[in-house]
Amino acid sequence: MEIKRVGSQSSAKGPAEWFTGTVRIDPLITAPDPALVTGASVTFEPGARTAWHTHPLGQTLIVTAGAGWVQREGGPVEEIHPGDVVWFPPDEKHWHGATPTTAMTHIAIQEKKDGKTVDWMEQVTDKQYRRR
């Protein structure tokens, strides 16, 4: 058994190649091999968002604070709130982040396939982001 105490893992700034705006990533689940699951609490300041990306085994988001937007490629931008759970199937191109005026925090859970949890793509443009 392993217990990770609150504050025992360092926060990381979301890298500019994967995010637009200010994003903080707080690791939650970093199970060692052979476990596949990983997870983090991710906080997006207003206007911040991910780049387009996919997950080889899908991704679950659990919104814990604020208001956010999510979109799958070709679909509408949808608003999400605390308590909402979002599932992106394997290899579904999507993005997620805060609304322009409200920060948003979610827990992101995904599994590793061949050691990889995500495939990052191009940035979400301001036009795509504000298409709501």
Predicted regions and their residues:
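Conserved strand-loop elements at the edges of beta-sheets that form or border functional pockets
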Residues: 30, 54, 62, 80-82, ...
